A protein has these predicted regions:
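The feature captures the beta-strand-to-loop junction immediately N-terminal to the Walker
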Residues: 39-41
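Conserved structural motif at the start of ABC-family nucleotide-binding domains
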Residues: 8, 23-25
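Short beta-strand immediately N-terminal to the Walker A/P-loop
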Residues: 36-37, 87
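Conserved ABC ATPase "signature" region
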Residues: 69-73, 109-129
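Helix-to-loop junction immediately C-terminal to a conserved catalytic motif
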Residues: 54
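ABC ATPase NBD Q-loop/coupling interface
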Residues: 63-83, 113-114
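Short coil-to-helix segment of the ABC ATPase nucleotide-binding domain corresponding to the Q-loop/switch region
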Residues: 98-107
């Protein structure tokens, strides 16, 4: 299924673990299809920004939109599996209680793909490696 690319907008987003905040009223608009690099020293908010976009954290203020769809605002966020995005972690880890095939199938299961289709896709993917 072909997906339509949508803009990503962060409007006045703030996030803090403590003082000072990691992101303070941060605003960014990314046009569909653009490639963006996040550069900066350790602790400047790059990973926090990605966690907010992925739905692994929620902002203290502001809002995040994918196109017209609100995916996060102060204290609330659409769950990661409902955001239609993917993220590859720098230091990834497999779920230790799952087999490799179960780890590969996990995002498909979260998307509601049928068991037979998951098994077909997992088998196809693992045959490549």
């Amino acid at each position: 299924m072909m997906r339509t690319l949508t803009p990503i907008t962060l409007q006045e987003v703030s996030f803090a673990f403590a003082e000072p905040p990691i992101l303070d009223r941060f605003t960014l608009h990314i046009e569909p299809g653009r490639i963006v690099a996040l550069l900066g020293p350790s602790g400047c908010g790059k990973s926090t920004l990605l966690r907010l976009l992925a739905g692994l954290s929620v902002p203290a203020s502001g809002e995040i939109r994918f196109g017209d769809r609100l995916v996060a605002r102060a204290g609330w966020g659409l769950p990661p599996e409902q955001r239609d995005i993917g993220m590859v972690f720098q230091d990834y880890a497999l779920w230790p209680h799952m087999s490799v095939a179960q780890n590969v199938a996990f995002p498909l299961r979260m998307r509601g793909v049928s068991r037979s289709e998951r098994e077909r896709r997992v088998s196809e993917a693992l045959a490549r490696v």
